[in-house]
């Protein structure tokens, strides 16, 4: 699934993301995955890969085998579904530990920069 900006805003609200940080999350998602749930990134320098809407990394957060594991206790394929419940829960866990600094897409394109306008959503 590819989310439009407003679909994304509505989905994130449904998942209980903090309204005050919503523009940051939208910016992050638009820069990390272009709003796509099914995206698997090219291998990173350390050989790890990033999965799904939030581009969550398999080095620490999800297991790339069929057995759920790592810090989010999920398989990486669970991050690629159209239902973003599991991905959202894991993204919040990453955020809780590292803030938005965990995501290069946010650091490079959103930090101290104009954030997307979601006022029409």
Swiss-Prot record:
Sequence ranges assigned to domain C-type lysozyme in this UniProt record: 1-121
EC number(s) on file: 3.2.1.17
Keyword Disulfide bond attached: yes
Reactions catalysed: Hydrolysis of (1->4)-beta-linkages between N-acetylmuramic acid and N-acetyl-D-glucosamine residues in a peptidoglycan and between N-acetyl-D-glucosamine residues in chitodextrins
Molecular function terms from GO: lysozyme activity
GO BP, one annotated term: killing of cells of another organism
Disulfide links within the chain: 6-121, 27-110, 62-76, 72-90
InterPro entries, per the entry: Glyco_hydro_22, Glyco_hydro_22_CS, Glyco_hydro_22_lys, Lysozyme-like_dom_sf
Pfam families: Lys
Residues annotated as the enzyme's active site: 32, 50
SMART domains per record: LYZ1 (SM00263)
Keywords, comma-separated and alphabetical: Antimicrobial, Bacteriolytic enzyme, Disulfide bond, Glycosidase, Hydrolase
Family, similarity comment: Belongs to the glycosyl hydrolase 22 family.
Function: Lysozymes have primarily a bacteriolytic function; those in tissues and body fluids are associated with the monocyte-macrophage system and enhance the activity of immunoagents.
Name the record gives this protein: Lysozyme
Organism, as annotated: Galleria mellonella (Greater wax moth)
